[in-house]
Amino acid sequence: HTDVVLESRQVTDASAPPIKKMPVRVGALEKLSHDVMRVQLQLPANNVFKYLAGQYIEFILRDGSRRAYSIATAPHVQETAPGIELHIRHMPGGLFTDHVFGALKEKEILRAEGPFGSFFLREDSDKPLVFLASGTGFAPIQALLTHMQHQGITRPVSLYWGGRRPEDLYSDAWIKELAARMPQLTYVPVVSDAQPEDNWTGRTGYVHQAVLDDFADLSGHEVYACGAPIVVDSARSSYISQRMLPEEAFFADAFTSAADK
């Protein structure tokens, strides 16, 4: 059985925020769906944690193994409410997520290190954006969208979010509210396995395919993709080979499964 780990090229840029180890305290736990938990973490008060929207942290477990989760909060939120939010999906049999869904309590202290990852918005570009997420791959996209709104970045952005069932799109209402305030945001929810009782009338099928259906040419776009490796890999190969997306205009964080030790 598996928990989730994020794989990403490290930032080598000199301006990248410094990586630090720190204790974090569980501030609040909230179930967003039957198998996704929002975990609010409080950071050490004396310790300014700098990161870029889209980056992730790693928990260091007692046995030394690590679990990586994208930060769903944009950095500017720290100024008013120090702390970060993570979206953790339950992988039954996974040591860490079983703990999160079974035993984790408010005030518990965890060890973390970060920030890591190169999944942050390239702000020197004004190209229109496609954000592609599957499942909890939405977490860093939430941070990117919040950051864009805060910074007044008006680049057109099309968000495609895929889940098996409608309830897997756990921040659907939040996105619709944001879109009302961000006229440049287009939101396309996609469900791959809708059941009759879901009464789903929206787009169906695979989320990476919905982008292929909507865009004949991605040569002038940038794509940011996060989620299951099959989604990210299918998107990368098909957009570059069939939709003229330049290879260097595809940015991704893929969740890969790591067997629990």
Task: Spell out what each predicted region is.
Residues 114-126:
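A short, basic/flexible loop-to-alpha-helix module at the beginning of a structural domain
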Residues 140-150:
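Histidine-anchored nucleotide/phosphate-binding helix
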Residues 14-109, 163-165, 190-193:
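Ferredoxin-reductase
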Residues 129-130, 224:
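Conserved beta-strand elements of the Class I
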Residues 1-36, 67, 110, 130, ...:
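Signature of N-terminal electron-transfer/Fe-S-associated modules in redox systems
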Residues 9-11, 62, 115:
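Short, surface-exposed secondary-structure boundary micro-motifs
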Residues 54, 137, 228:
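Short, conserved phosphate/pyrophosphate- and ester-handling motifs at nucleotide-, phospho-/glycolipid
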Residues 156-261:
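Reductase modules of NAD(P)H-dependent flavoproteins
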